């Protein structure tokens, strides 16, 4: 199993503001959906997120369609039946290895927030791949991605990930994929 981190991050490491995204970039949302839903036939991907990330998703998009939704929270008191709630990232991984899920899960995607990103990057049991939308400017944020040295990561060129730079709604951005070396530390 590999842990895949999906993140849009500004040059000042920002990922969120006021419980939501600090930008509206349709192309990034399309990238997120494509990356997290593309699975082998007969399988589904799992998206693992913290409570605040779950709560930031508009009701009309809950659950994230065609994916197994797992929320990591010790305080979420009630959740719809279509969502699995677990107390930790390790519990989420254990759940995905149980009989109910192990035969239907293709890839696991960590989609936020900070604590889960940090745990995924810090652990050394599973290989980590980062699918990143680099927002090529500093953005006013109150939630941040753990700092990594992008130059120490192995850039991965995938045929379905565009190498171009795009501009939308005043934000210039590009998509990149990185493999995190096992000796990477956060």
From Swiss-Prot:
Keywords, ordered alphabetically: NADP, One-carbon metabolism, Oxidoreductase
Annotated substrate binding lies at 28-33, 67
- Catalysed transformations (reactions): (6S)-5,6,7,8-tetrahydrofolate + NADP(+) = 7,8-dihydrofolate + NADPH + H(+)
* Gene3D superfamilies according to UniProt: Dihydrofolate Reductase, subunit A (3.40.430.10)
* One Pfam family matching this protein: DHFR_1
One function term, GO molecular function aspect: NADP binding
* This protein's pathway: Cofactor biosynthesis; tetrahydrofolate biosynthesis; 5,6,7,8-tetrahydrofolate from 7,8-dihydrofolate: step 1/1
Q: Does the keyword Oxidoreductase apply?
A: yes
Q: A GO term (biological process) for this protein?
A: dihydrofolate metabolic process
Q: Which PROSITE patterns match?
A: DHFR_1 (PS00075), DHFR_2 (PS51330)
Q: Which residues bind NADP(+)?
A: 8, 14-20, 51-53, 73-75, 112-119
Q: Where is the DHFR domain?
A: 2-180
Keyword Plastid among record annotations: no
The terms describing its cellular component in GO are: mitochondrion
Q: What is the stated purpose of this protein?
A: Key enzyme in folate metabolism. Contributes to the de novo mitochondrial thymidylate biosynthesis pathway. Catalyzes an essential reaction for de novo glycine and purine synthesis, and for DNA precursor synthesis.
Which protein family is named in the record?
Belongs to the dihydrofolate reductase family.
Subunit architecture? Monomer.
The name under which this protein is listed is: Dihydrofolate reductase
């Amino acid at each position: 199993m590999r842990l895949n981190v999906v993140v849009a991050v500004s040059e000042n490491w920002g990922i969120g503001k006021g419980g939501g995204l600090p930008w509206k970039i349709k192309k990034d949302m399309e990238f997120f959906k494509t990356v997290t839903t593309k699975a082998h036939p007969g399988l589904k991907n799992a998206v693992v997120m913290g409570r605040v990330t779950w709560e930031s998703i508009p009701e009309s998009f809950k659950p994230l369609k065609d994916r197994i939704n797992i929320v990591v929270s010790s305080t979420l008191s009630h959740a719809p039946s279509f969502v699995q709630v677990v107390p930790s990232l390790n519990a989420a991984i254990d759940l995905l290895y149980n009989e109910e899920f192990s035969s239907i899960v293709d890839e696991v995607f960590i989609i936020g927030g900070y604590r889960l990103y940090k745990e995924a990057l810090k652990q050394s049991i599973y290989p980590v791949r980062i699918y990143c939308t680099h927002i090529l400017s500093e953005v006013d944020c109150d939630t941040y991605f753990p700092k990594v040295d992008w130059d120490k990561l192995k850039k991965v060129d995938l045929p379905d990930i565009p190498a171009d730079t795009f501009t939308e709604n005043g934000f210039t951005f590009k998509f990149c994929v990185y493999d995190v070396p096992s000796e990477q530390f956060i």
